[in-house]
């Protein structure tokens, strides 16, 4: 463990210093795009490994430490979440507010209440005063990620900082999967989707990484807009029919505000058909809300399926056998081991 921490700390230091010496307007140059696995029927050797929030099961989510860890593992892509600050900086953070389960103030104390600390009400300089490098003991997050290693001193990074680190620290070119966080149900919590998506696309173009990036969102308005302003960037349609978030709203009167004007009931409840109508080719459902039949039908429509976010070996294996094209996971190390072992067994005479 000490050896791993030493290697990671040195890699992070090199990456951060390398990025810090470049002016903000100067791009880090990266290698060429690689093609993620594709095909109508997924096999072990063609499953895309996408690190969720970097590698949140192993290092603090959405931090440079997590993305460096994902690079070390050798993922095909990293997934991250973006929001806009009060001074219009694109930062990498999952929640609309600072999360008390992972956030400490500059005096080292855990946040007690996030209600007055919305990301869009804080400047980048203010956000950089918070430490997000450790899980709060006994918190739900701590129970969710028992293997996560603390990395004290980690700050909320900007999208540009993550891009720079990936270009400098990954041994192979990987894809960048950016989830844009906006909500139609509480519009004051974020700027309009057009504003955020345009800023993200602008950064991708300036950093010369748009050819190996994908845009994800539960708010399909972002995806439809990206398809108009940057059709070369693939869009990935997220879906969840849960209690705290339901962007599909099957059986409810009228179109879901999340689905860019589409009503799922007009498509007999078929999310792949709705995605096709929106102009999409990639679907990312919650892994517990997809069946082998749905995956097969999505493939018949030319839509690839990338599930999120199973972390147990049994769930990963089951999903691979169901035919998914890729898995977004907090434990890319486990997924890589499963694929390596299974591919080796399949290659035996």
Please provide the spans of the model-predicted regions:
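N-terminal secretory signal peptides that target proteins for export/translocation
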Residues: 1-7
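Phosphate-group recognition and catalysis centered on beta-loop-alpha active-site segments
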Residues: 7-13, 17, 21-349
